[in-house]
Amino acid sequence: MSWKIQVCLIALLVLIGGNAANGQGKRKVIIDQDAAGPGGTDMQAILALVNSPDTEVLGITVLTGDAWRDEEVQHTLRLLEIIGRPDIPVLPGAVFPLVNSKEYMLGWEKLYGKQVYMGAWNFAKGYAVHGPYEIPPMPEGAPKIKASEEHASHFLRRMVRTYPHEVTIYAAGPMTDLALAIADDPEFAGLTKELIVMGGSINPTTDDPEFALSPTHEFNFWMDPEATRAVLHAKWPRLVLTTVDISVKTRMGKELIDEIRKSPTPAAQYVTKYAEPNILWDELAAVAWLDSSIITKWKMLYLDVDVGHGSGYGNTIVWPEGRQPGLGEIEGEVQDDLDKEKFYREFVELMARPTPRATKNEK
């Protein structure tokens, strides 16, 4: 190799390194999450995206889902303190669905039977029953940093206007914040780069009581069906879905927890302290976005949600090409199978690695 070529290669490497150090070339993402905590699938998905050296997390928008919004905001802020990323803004979003409510679902249960899981409405974390604006004692300690005063839907709209066609929206909770953004700005969806969704259920192979007898009834879709429908009818440049069907093929077991425990980083110690054996619902959606080669099989399907107020309220509806009704539903890339060993390996690496510091563009 001639000295001229060597000099050119060195200059190229320096340029690439400089761009990476300045945050250039990173994938911009907004995390829209129902961030129950401490630990668990919501927080571990946030960690995967924040800990990746290839992402620029513009902000974390938080709405009611697995827990009430204000409680989730506090857990998110505390997580960011623990891992040394207090610079990432946390934006409070929707407290309640557009139409659905706990009272409505209690009435629905009298007609159609008990729900297995109701998120904030059945207090799955075992805390004492509390109202939507109360914060129970936090096992990890209360945060010192504060959430932004900007509303999540406004932030979502502002970011896609600031970075048109560059921002990925990662949505792993109910769709209320996105529906509000769409209602306020009809061009919002088209100005994003893509929408990555953890939600929906088609025909999963599982003995999980939540889905074994009600295979299309998935929480993120049914908690706010009207919002889900608005999102699934918006004109996203690309729509990717991690449904229950593929999620139930994964598991956060003792072996993964023990592997993560070997790392001394604050992120790893946080994960192992609060980890619970469970399906890696949101983590799969996050890691598969970071490395799409984890997914080995896809289906192209048109999707919608049942907004009729009967037994199927909130259920996922799908059609293959040619059978969709043509009422505005769009086609999505539905993940169908994965390389589990590769996913587990990359998930452990993301949980265990040191959290990247904010670049000057991110501060």
Model-derived regions, located:
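Surface-exposed loop and adjacent secondary-structure segments within mature catalytic domains
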Residues: 88-146
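Bacterial Sec-dependent signal peptides at the C-terminal "C-region" and cleavage site
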Residues: 15-26
